[in-house]
Amino acid sequence: EAAAPLRTTLSPEHARTIIARNSSPDVGFDRSINPYKGCEHGCIYCYARPSHAWMGLSPGLDFESRIFFKPEAARLLEQELAKPRYVCKRIHIGGNTDPYQPIERETKSTRSILEVMQRFRQPFSIITKSVLIARDADILGPMGRDGLCSAYVSITTLDRKLARAMEPRASTPTKR
């Protein structure tokens, strides 16, 4: 049984940089890219929900229906990777919100980021709950074979009913 559809509002967020850095020893990566703020999947356990509260929005339904994207993401990434002082290290994509949520079909933000990664042969990892990741197999496959990319698909449970309750708008476990 599918979750009730939400009307999604998509708004641009004009970032100055695209690669976020962290120095926490508790996180398995020190560089990340999140093409979106907010996530249409609506996972009840999501730890990223407070990011909307920091913007004066609800971490509940606003987080699921008011999505922000970075239209200049690919250009910003290309600028950062081209800097003479850039030190190449693996970048994690999707550590905060899913890079392949439904709105990605329209924006292709994640796809444009992957195209830059491919041109620069920039190592990365990516995680999702969406079957939309298969769309980008033409990039992920060759880069994976070259040891430049790792792709992860998260499956919380194989129980479809429980998955729908926990992750109402994510791809079903069977499809993942």
Regions found by a protein language model. Name each.
Residues 2-36, 44-152, 156-164, 172-176:
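Conserved Radical SAM active-site core
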